[in-house]
């Protein structure tokens, strides 16, 4: 009991709020503490992710401290003190809040019927609760010129209330000082320096922060109202982190994608690629089955598929790491049914061999426990935007050193760039470098993040990451950042990379959803092969080499389980019903499995999701049967060329993103900005 009382004396203080006594943590502001107690204090400028500004004066509370006079203070900047008395709803506060709302409405246009923020506007809600029912303004309203903010954000600056959330978001989270306030007094306005567009990997989140309709989404403008939309939960399938999202749709059309709060992954943010990925499903789509470029029926295509599978000729199925765990599981079962069938991946052999179960870290553990972070062949600002944001937040609020082993590139994190080749990096991790040898020995919070994109480079294949990392005492497990949404699941399924000999020996080649990256596409185009069946959602250069092309159901028409970079299983939910023309990989593979009743495993297939999600499978590797081998011992085979970054463009990092007009426009604006700087 003594320890418990001492704990509360140190960590907790007693305060009085609205004549009720509460115990609350130290070092909390009055606004944060009241929110923790479930008491509502109105605000406009305060946000949990940003620093305190105190611009709006809407969060006023009355404070009584001992014998001092009772006075109103700003609750977002006032910390809780012991024996403090706080009043939240006095006549003085009601009048002050009404005056603040009236002042904000003096120059605010009355265009709520045409505003995209209507129904979700903080100014509307707080005017109804705290505002007055009459107007004393008899002058003309001020007009402010709209700024060109790029292809994502639409500005109507006459609605701006100068909360400066967007300014602080750009400076503190994005690391760019594009926005700021100009002029003074009544003529104050938010503007961008040199009229630069808002271009960042997280710039779409500014719209979510804006409490009024000054900043809205350009693709969403004048399309629908928020109360007309249905909402479904899902995950981001554009990177390996798997951010949680809300999908807003009406009928058969997706109108916008918003972040879902998940403190372990994406917090309250999502990348622009995740926000506008749905636009790629509207362009360059396969809409009907094709036979040598001409339309054909689905039944005839299924007959040809069944005929090819049942023949004794060798078949090759090529897939990538963007398909779900259920499809990978069914592909494994298909090989047990048909001995003439081989399943290969387009992922390089290096990635498969260097992955093992122990090399799986956690994003939260790396961010919280690391004091020195090593980035190997990784551009976080392109390949994992949200992890880059978390490391930047750690750097700004605590001590964190970031060392990037790659050539120099623009980043919003303060990093030390060390341009080494794979051989020198191997010597460095062994402690043969004076500076880093001492750093590895003395640093308690040492963490490592490995990129997957630049590991395609020829010559790094002999670098055994496994053996190197076993000798280093990392504070957390190293983390591999993949390129696709199920890159960890593809590694655990132990699919081997295809070779040129596999393609030449196969009679028919099946291609399943092959649009992962430009590297894999180039390798397939250079391979002399005849593709028999092409299954995908979009056209591609490989589709021209296929005899049969079948449209696949989009990611929003199917559900599936995906493993993110932490090997965390997450469910992508189905939003729309699949039409009669498109094909689902689940249904296609189950159809092929059902034609052999003597080996029917449908009682087993009905439990496939529970089997895949069983934690013991990932711990013991019962089905996947993954083994780690040491294959790199000869330093002569290691490349002597320095590592170079491959992914420079966040918006077009995958082939599917190249079909989105919104992301293409973002990429063009980014290239224009880079050309102007140099």
Locations of regions flagged by a protein language model:
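Anionic-ligand anchoring segments at beta-strand to alpha-helix junctions in alpha/beta enzyme folds, i.e.
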Residues: 318-366, 465-495
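N-terminal mitochondrial targeting presequence
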Residues: 1-10
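Phosphate/diphosphate-binding loops
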Residues: 202-259, 368-400, 405, 515, ...
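Cofactor-/ligand-binding subdomain signature composed of acidic, glycine-rich
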Residues: 138, 248-313, 368-372, 381-384, ...
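N-terminal leader/propeptide and maturation segments of large enzyme subunits in energy/redox metabolism
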Residues: 110-139, 576-623
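Active-site phosphate/pyrophosphate-binding segments
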Residues: 301-305, 399-402, 406-505, 599, ...
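Fe-S ferredoxin-like electron-transfer domains
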Residues: 57-236, 241-245, 253
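A cross-kingdom feature strongest in bacterial/archaeal respiratory oxidoreductases
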Residues: 46, 332, 368, 381-389, ...
């Amino acid at each position: 009991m003594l320890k418990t009382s001492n704990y509360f004396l140190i960590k907790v203080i007693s305060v009085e709020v609205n004549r009720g006594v509460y115990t609350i943590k130290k070092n909390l502001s009055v606004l944060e503490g009241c929110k923790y107690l479930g008491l509502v204090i109105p605000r406009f400028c305060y946000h949990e992710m940003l620093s305190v500004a105190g611009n709006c004066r809407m969060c006023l509370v009355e404070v009584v401290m001992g014998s001092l006079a009772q006075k109103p203070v700003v609750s977002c900047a006032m910390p809780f003190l012991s024996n403090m008395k706080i009043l939240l709803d006095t006549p003085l506060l009601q009048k002050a809040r009404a005056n603040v709302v009236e002042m904000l409405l003096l120059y605010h246009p009355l265009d709520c019927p045409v505003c995209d923020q209507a129904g979700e506007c903080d100014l509307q809600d707080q005017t109804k609760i705290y505002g007055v029912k009459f107007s004393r303004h008899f002058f003309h309203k001020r007009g402010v010129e709209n700024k060109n903010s790029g292809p994502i954000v639409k500005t109507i600056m006459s609605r701006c209330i100068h909360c400066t959330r967007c300014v602080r978001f750009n400076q503190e989270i994005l690391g760019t000082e594009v926005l700021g306030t100009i002029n003074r007094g009544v003529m104050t306005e938010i503007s961008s320096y040199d009229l630069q567009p808002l271009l960042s990997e997280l710039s779409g989140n500014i719209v979510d922060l804006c409490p009024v309709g000054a900043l809205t989404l350009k693709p969403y403008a004048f399309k629908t109202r928020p109360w007309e939309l249905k909402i479904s939960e899902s995950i981001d399938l554009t990177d390996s982190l798997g951010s949680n999202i809300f999908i807003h749709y009406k009928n058969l059309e997706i109108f916008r994608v918003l972040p879902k709060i998940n403190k372990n992954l994406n917090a309250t943010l999502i990348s622009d690629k995740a926000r506008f990925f749905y636009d790629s499903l509207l362009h360059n789509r396969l809409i009907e089955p094709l036979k040598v470029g001409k339309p054909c029926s689905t039944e005839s295509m299924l007959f040809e598929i069944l005929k090819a599978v049942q023949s004794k000729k060798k078949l090759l199925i090529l897939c990538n790491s963007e398909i779900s765990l259920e499809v990978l599981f069914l592909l494994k079962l298909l090989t047990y049914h048909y001995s003439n069938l081989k399943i290969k991946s387009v992922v390089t052999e290096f990635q498969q061999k260097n992955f093992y179960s122990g090399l799986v870290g956690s994003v939260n553990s790396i961010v919280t426990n690391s004091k020195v972070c090593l980035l190997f062949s990784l551009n976080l600002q392109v390949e994992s935007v949200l992890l880059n944001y978390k490391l930047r937040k750690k750097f700004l609020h605590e001590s964190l050193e970031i060392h990037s082993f790659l050539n120099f590139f623009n980043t919003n994190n303060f990093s030390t760039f060390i341009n080494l080749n794979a051989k020198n990096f191997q010597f460095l991790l062994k402690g043969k470098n004076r500076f880093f040898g001492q750093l590895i020995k003395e640093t308690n919070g040492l963490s490592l993040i490995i990129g997957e994109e630049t590991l395609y480079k020829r010559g790094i294949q002999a670098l055994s990451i496994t053996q190197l990392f076993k000798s280093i005492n990392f504070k957390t497990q190293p983390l591999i950042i993949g390129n696709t949404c199920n890159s960890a699941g593809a590694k655990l399924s132990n699919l081997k990379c295809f070779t040129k000999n596999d393609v030449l020996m196969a009679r028919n080649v099946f291609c399943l959803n092959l649009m992962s990256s430009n590297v894999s596409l180039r390798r397939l185009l250079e391979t002399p092969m005849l593709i028999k069946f092409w299954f995908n959602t979009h056209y591609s250069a490989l589709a021209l080499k296929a005899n049969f092309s079948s449209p696949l159901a989009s990611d929003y028409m199917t559900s599936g389980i995906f493993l993110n970079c932490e090997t965390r299983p997450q469910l992508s939910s189905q939003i729309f019903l699949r039409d009669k023309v498109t094909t689902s990989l689940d249904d296609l593979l189950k159809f092929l499995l059902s034609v052999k009743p003597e080996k029917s495993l449908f009682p087993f297939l009905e439990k496939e999701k529970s089997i895949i999600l069983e934690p013991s499978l990932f711990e013991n590797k019962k089905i996947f049967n993954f083994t780690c081998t040491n294959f790199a011992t000869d330093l002569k085979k290691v490349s002597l060329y320095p590592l170079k970054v491959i992914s420079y463009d966040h918006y077009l990092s995958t082939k599917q993103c190249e079909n989105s007009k919104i992301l293409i426009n973002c990429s063009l604006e980014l290239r224009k900005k880079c050309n102007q700087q140099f």
